[in-house]
Each structure stands twice: as structure tokens, then as C-alpha cells.
């Protein structure tokens, strides 16, 4: 559980072993990291369908060895042009599930096309082949999918089309059962044949929009036709002599950078890992970052986001000086956690750190008719308060929790890391990177060590600090004494999300780690 997988040439990590294996096969067939990443992404949409799918969004953080460029592809969708606050008149918030929550165009399929056109060697049809096979012929359903199905069984069983795919006469499938998605296979075959246009302009787009409109949605075919993701420069900061890269807004990536800037003011050689001091400082630094994030984060096309000020080291020092022994009360808005993070490094040194999501588990719970495509509920995170920075407006991207990360040194990737978890993403990322850079842990150890999550996640109203049962009694008591509302959960609790990481060591070998809390795998050669 604490031993990283070692590769001499290539490494793929993901939250599902079948997706990791598929990515490795694409590399073996002559594809590069970008081809393999798209293959993994598509496979996750099939074998991890409760967490991600064609109806969701994605963010891609890429390193191209030939040009040495670090770039981000923003594969998040915008709200429909007719979706205004007036649509929800009389409501205090956008519904978390159902048609009224499926109000943004899915961006992931577009991102596949963009990444392959920019850097890929293989065709879209080639890299989609493993996903098409898993959808057509089935795969053993994971325990994680069964658990989330059982948790949401009433919702899923009562939703047309969704019930037929994800339940067995109103009950959850059992782990290991063959799970076949023939309608999704047909949709993937259409995309393989006709490309992104099938999803945004052609038959699939028409069928998705028809289903939405027949059930009262304000989304239109023009919303799908208008969708374009874009390449962008990452946001970055230095930590302990390393360059840390994140996706720019509307991603919450800068939250992770601000937190590291705060923590750089602490000497971790004087703080024992796993001690009260370690966890307390990290939690309080994250709370500071969340306050700034929540005040400014939205679509940068609709607001000025003061990244230069927020990522100024002097500002981080001020925040660090405000952290004392007592826990500071803070609030966090409930967010979803249905996310899948994965990463790939190939033999040439190309690297992709990417993440995708439906937002909540099973997204909106709306399957677009006979397409087999489950639609995200990401738009439910918009506010209906006209004065809120993330207020709902037409053709706007919402505050996004997805945040793939990459650490470079000497102009080359050293660590790729990320996690599932919504509000937990910056928390787990901070744990992983401090463990690796400050305490010298390898990826698997950094991921497997006891974790925590503060605040609301998985859509729940919660203001406490949940810690895994492997925290020492002494640490738990000290956290309580300092004012943290501590709840002890399982030793390897799925609530903590599923993380993954790849490290390039000093010899150039690849170390991969996947989360023991789930079904993931690191596969290297």
C-alpha cells in the first residue's frame, strides 16, 4: 500500500485500473502522452460513470517536451444564452439535480479534439477504441460505483433512462457484475467517426438538446454550436525552489498556490509530520485561501480577478502571520466531489495532468434520452444573487473546482498530482505536495498517509474537520483543544477522495502512486 510503482519509460495513473491499463496500451502502440491521456479520459467516462462522463467538463495541464511549453486547456462549458436568473424566479438557489441543474454545455469532448489536434499522433477513433470496447462489451462494475449507486438509489431509480442504465430494477448492481452501456457505445462510435462536430453540431447534439427541451430546459442547439474551449497560460508560483503550475480561473487552481505561498513561511523541518502542528497549520492556511477564493472566483470574462495581488508572497506572509493556535471559524459552500484525476508521462518526457467531472456523483442524474450520456450539474453552483461574484448570467462559466497540478524544476516536470474531492481538492493536493517536497515521501506514501477534509463536500452541509481513524489520539485531542470540530471517520475513508501522482526521480525513473481508498492503479513500464 505504501510502495510506488516504478517505470523506466512511461507511467499512467488514474482512479480506475482499466483506464490506466488502456492508457498504457496506447503508449505501447506508438501514441504519446497526449494520445494516452485522451484514451484514459474516455475510458473513465465509461468505467467510472458515476464520477465523470461525456456530459461533463475537464481541465488539462500539459507539458510538451519539444517546445518545453506548459499550457492549460480549459474544457469547461458555459451556461445557455437563455438561462438567466429570471428562469429561477421564486427560488433561492438553482436545484442541485434534474433538468434545471443541467444548464451548462459539456466541455470534455471538445477538449479531446483540442488536445489531439495540438499534440497527438493518433486519430480520435484510435484513442477512443478502448472506451468503445468497455462500453459495448462491459466491464466489472467497481465497488465505488456500487456504493454511490446505493447512496443515490432513490434519485437514480426515479429518473427515466438513468434508471435503466445505472440500476437493476431499482437496486444497485453488485461489485464485479458486468456493466454494459450499449447506447453510450453508439455515441462514442459516432464521435469516433465524425469527431467533435457530432457532439456539438450533429446528431448527438440534436438528440441531447431535444431531450432537454422536451423536459422544460432553456438550453438550445446554438449553445452547443457556440461552445469552444481554449488554450491558456497556467498560473504559477514557486515553492521550495520548485515551479508549481495550476489551471487559471475559472478553475480554483490559484487556491492551491496561495496555500503553498502561506506555508512557505513555515519551517517544516521543525514540524513533525502527522503532528497537531502539521495538520493545524495546513487546515488554517487553506481556510485563508478559501476566503479569498470565494470572494473573487468566477468566469474571468465577467469579472477582474486580482491574481497578482493574491499570489504576491508578501500577501501570503501577512496571512501566515494571522494563523495562531486557535482554529478560525469559517464557512464553506457545499460542493460536489464526483471527479476523476489522472496523469501520464511518456518516454519522450511529454506530460499531461488532467481532471474531469460531472460535479456531483451522477451529475444532474439526467441522461440525455437514448444517447447514454449523463449530463453534469455544474451550473447549479452559480448563485442567484445578482450581487454575488459568481451570479448566473448567460454564456458564463461558473466557479470550477477542477484543478490539475504540475511541479517543474529546471524546465521539466518533476511531479504531476491531483485528486477527486471538490472542496477537498486543494486540501489533498496540499497534503500530497508538502509530504513529497517537505518530508521526502514518494508518491504512494504521500497519498496513503492519513488524510483529512475540512468543510462541506459531497454536497453535504458540514462545518467540521473530518479526519481518518489513523490520526493519533494525541493529535486528535490537540485539534479539538484548539477549536477544531473534529469527526473521526474510517481509516481509509472514501470521503477523502481518490488521489494520484507521478514523480520523476533524480535518475529519471518514474514513480507512480494511486489511492488505496478506491479502484485506481499506477501502470508503468
Swiss-Prot record:
InterPro entries listed in its UniProt record: GGT-like_enzyme, GGT_lsub_C, GGT_peptidase, GGT_ssub, Ntn_hydrolases_N
Ranges in coiled-coil conformation: none
Keyword Transferase: yes
EC number(s) reported in the record: 2.3.2.2, 3.4.19.13
GO function terms (MF aspect): glutathione hydrolase activity; leukotriene C4 gamma-glutamyl transferase activity
Catalysed reactions, semicolon-separated: an N-terminal (5-L-glutamyl)-[peptide] + an alpha-amino acid = 5-L-glutamyl amino acid + an N-terminal L-alpha-aminoacyl-[peptide]; glutathione + H2O = L-cysteinylglycine + L-glutamate; an S-substituted glutathione + H2O = an S-substituted L-cysteinylglycine + L-glutamate
Similarity section: Belongs to the gamma-glutamyltransferase family.
The name this protein goes by in its record: Glutathione hydrolase-like YwrD proenzyme
Species of the source: Bacillus subtilis (strain 168)
Lineage: Bacteria, Bacillati, Bacillota, Bacilli, Bacillales
Gene name of the record: ywrD
Amino acid at each position: 500500500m505504501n510502495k510506488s510503482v516504478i517505470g523506466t519509460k512511461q507511467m499512467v495513473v488514474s482512479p480506475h485500473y482499466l483506464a490506466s491499463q488502456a492508457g498504457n496500451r496506447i503508449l505501447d502502440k506508438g501514441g504519446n502522452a497526449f494520445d494516452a491521456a485522451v484514451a484514459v479520459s474516455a475510458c473513465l467516462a465509461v468505467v467510472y460513470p458515476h464520477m465523470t462522463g461525456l456530459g461533463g467538463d475537464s481541465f488539462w495541464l500539459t507539458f510538451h517536451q519539444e517546445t518545453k511549453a506548459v499550457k492549460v486547456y480549459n474544457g469547461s462549458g458555459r451556461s445557455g444564452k437563455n438561462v438567466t436568473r429570471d428562469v429561477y424566479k421564486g427560488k433561492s438557489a438553482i436545484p442541485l439535480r434534474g433538468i434545471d441543474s443541467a444548464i451548462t454545455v459539456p466541455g470534455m469532448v471538445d477538449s479531446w479534439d483540442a488536445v489531439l489536434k495540438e499534440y497527438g499522433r493518433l486519430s480520435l477513433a484510435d484513442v477512443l477504441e478502448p472506451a468503445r470496447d468497455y462500453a459495448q462489451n462491459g466491464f466489472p462494475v467497481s465497488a465505488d460505483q456500487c456504493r454511490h449507486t446505493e447512496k443515490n438509489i432513490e434519485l437514480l431509480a426515479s429518473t427515466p433512462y438513468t434508471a435503466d442504465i445505472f440500476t437493476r430494477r431499482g437496486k444497485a448492481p453488485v461489485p464485479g457484475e458486468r456493466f454494459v452501456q450499449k447506447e453510450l457505445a453508439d455515441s462514442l462510435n459516432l464521435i469516433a467517426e465524425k469527431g467533435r462536430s457530432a457532439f456539438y453540431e450533429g446528431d448527438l447534439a440534436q438528440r441531447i438538446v431535444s431531450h432537454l427541451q422536451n423536459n422544460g430546459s432553456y438550453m438550445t442547439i446554438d449553445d452547443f454550436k457556440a461552445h469552444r474551449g481554449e488554450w491558456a497560460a497556467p498560473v504559477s508560483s514557486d515553492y521550495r525552489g520548485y515551479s508549481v503550475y495550476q489551471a487559471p480561473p475559472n478553475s480554483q487552481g490559484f487556491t492551491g498556490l496561495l496555500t503553498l505561498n502561506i506555508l512557505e513561511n513555515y519551517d517544516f523541518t521543525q514540524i513533525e509530520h502527522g503532528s497537531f502542528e502539521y495538520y493545524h497549520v495546513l487546515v488554517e492556511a487553506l481556510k485563508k485561501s478559501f476566503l479569498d477564493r470565494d470572494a473573487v472566483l468566477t468566469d474571468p470574462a465577467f469579472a477582474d480577478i486580482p491574481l497578482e495581488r493574491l499570489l504576491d508572497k508578501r500577501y501570503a506572509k501577512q496571512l501566515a502571520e494571522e494563523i495562531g493556535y486557535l482554529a478560525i471559524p469559517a464557512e464553506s459552500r457545499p460542493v460536489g466531489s464526483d471527479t476523476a484525476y489522472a496523469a501520464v508521462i511518456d518516454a519522450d518526457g511529454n506530460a499531461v495532468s488532467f481532471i474531469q467531472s460531472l460535479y456531483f456523483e451522477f451529475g444532474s442524474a439526467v441522461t440525455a434520452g437514448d444517447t447514454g450520456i449523463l449530463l453534469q450539474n455544474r451550473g447549479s453552483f452559480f448563485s442567484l444573487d445578482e450581487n454575488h461574484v459568481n451570479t448566473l448570467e448567460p454564456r458564463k462559466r461558473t466557479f470550477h473546482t477542477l484543478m490539475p497540478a504540475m511541479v517543474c524544476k529546471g524546465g521539466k516536470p518533476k511531479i504531476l498530482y491531483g485528486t477527486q474531492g471538490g472542496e477537498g481538492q486543494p486540501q489533498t493536493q496540499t497534503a500530497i505536495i508538502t509530504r513529497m517536497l517537505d518530508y521526502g515521501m514518494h508518491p504512494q506514501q504521500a497519498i496513503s498517509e492519513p488524510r483529512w477534509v475540512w468543510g462541506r463536500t459531497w454536497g453535504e452541509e458540514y462545518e467540521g474537520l473530518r479526519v481518518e481513524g489513523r490520526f493519533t489520539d494525541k493529535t486528535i485531542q490537540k485539534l479539538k483543544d484548539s477549536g477544531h470540530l473534529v469527526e473521526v471517520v474510517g481509516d481509509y475513508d472514501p470521503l477523502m477522495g481518490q488521489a494520484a501522482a507521478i514523480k520523476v526521480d533524480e535518475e529519471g525513473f518514474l514513480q507512480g502512486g494511486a489511492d488505496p481508498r478506491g479502484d485506481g492503479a499506477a501502470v508503468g513500464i
